[in-house]
């Protein structure tokens, strides 16, 4: 429904397919972005493997094969796809273990072949860049670490990808073209590059951007920040809140005295060895001035009619600890759901 809402142009409520109000939708991540080993993150070297211990690889494809590739509206299927960083471990019959963006099986045989996808395929960001260390947030060239940057571009093109996400340097692409000429001849190289050019340009033609790439400021001002749209969005958010339990009919509450306990906010590690946000601290999880519009605030549990407690899941890192490695371990640690230290 979301993809159809983006891509289709509607006239008097009728889906007319591609048109001037269409937005190209890029879906991600093929063939899935969830089953990283140990719950780790494939943005890092330590999370580069996707594993399927229950042999559920095909189940993960259903969001694509029965969803975004099988739209009921006039556009038919999502017009662009982004593969994920992971190495889909044990899936390629040839035994090759490379990131999905490099895989001739995942992209060529499955996506392009079995599922006949001929839209734009764009790599995830930075897959051709070098990776400095296991914990580094830089390049994500999984399975191709020993190859040159040019060879990485060449392999991605061989897999059937059209666009390099996060790459602003044309030099390695031009060098990859030369490699294609050496292996398949000038005509073969032109055919391959023109194939991607057609896929990329087609979306501009479909949406009318090739003929008119400009936006009417008057129309834009009517759409952006439109009060009716904002109201509809807010109401949709309210409806998305699901009450799991209401033991003893605790809700709804009339105006009463409520206690809001503070919550602990740890300092969060970020990319490039940096930290995100302020130092670790205790603070209220909501704006108390806003809450005073609806409740009388209690200064302690004893004087409150009830409490509203905001709980956040424990955070113990992304499953890799540099300090563990420095102490002689391998760095790989469980992602614990305990609030206390993992033992």
Give the location of each predicted region:
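Glycoside hydrolase catalytic-domain context in secreted enzymes
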Residues: 1-343
């Amino acid at each position: 429904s979301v993809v159809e809402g983006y891509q289709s142009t509607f006239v008097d409520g009728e889906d007319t397919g591609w048109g001037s109000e269409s937005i190209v939708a890029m879906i991600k991540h093929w063939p899935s972005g969830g089953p990283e080993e140990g719950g780790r993150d494939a943005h890092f070297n330590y999370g580069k493997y996707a594993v399927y211990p229950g042999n559920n690889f095909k189940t993960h494809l259903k969001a694509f094969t029965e969803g975004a590739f099988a739209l009921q509206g006039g556009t038919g299927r999502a017009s662009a796809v982004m593969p994920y960083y992971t190495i889909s471990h044990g899936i390629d019959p040839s035994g090759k273990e490379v990131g999905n963006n490099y895989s001739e099986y995942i992209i060529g045989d499955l996506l392009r072949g079995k599922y006949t996808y001929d839209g734009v395929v764009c790599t995830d960001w930075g897959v051709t860049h070098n990776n400095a260390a296991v914990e580094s947030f830089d390049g994500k060239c999984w399975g191709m670490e020993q190859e040159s940057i040019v060879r990485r571009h060449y392999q991605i093109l061989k897999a059937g990808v059209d666009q390099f996400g996060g790459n602003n340097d044309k030099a390695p692409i031009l060098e990859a073209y030369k490699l294609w000429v050496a292996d398949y001849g000038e005509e073969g190289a032109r055919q391959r590059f023109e194939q991607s050019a057609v896929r990329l340009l087609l979306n501009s033609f479909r949406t009318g951007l090739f003929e008119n790439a400009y936006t009417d400021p008057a129309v834009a001002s009517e759409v952006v920040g439109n009060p009716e749209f904002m109201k509809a969005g807010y109401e949709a958010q309210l409806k998305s809140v699901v009450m799991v339990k209401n033991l003893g009919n605790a809700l709804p509450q009339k105006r009463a005295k409520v206690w809001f306990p503070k919550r602990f906010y740890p300092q969060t590690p970020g990319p490039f060895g940096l930290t995100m946000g302020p130092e670790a601290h205790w603070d209220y999880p909501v704006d108390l001035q806003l809450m005073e519009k609806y409740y009388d605030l209690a200064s302690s549990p004893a004087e409150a009619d009830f409490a509203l407690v905001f709980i956040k899941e424990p955070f113990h890192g992304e499953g890799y600890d540099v300090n563990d490695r420095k102490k002689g371990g391998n760095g790989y640690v469980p992602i614990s759901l305990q609030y206390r230290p993992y033992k």
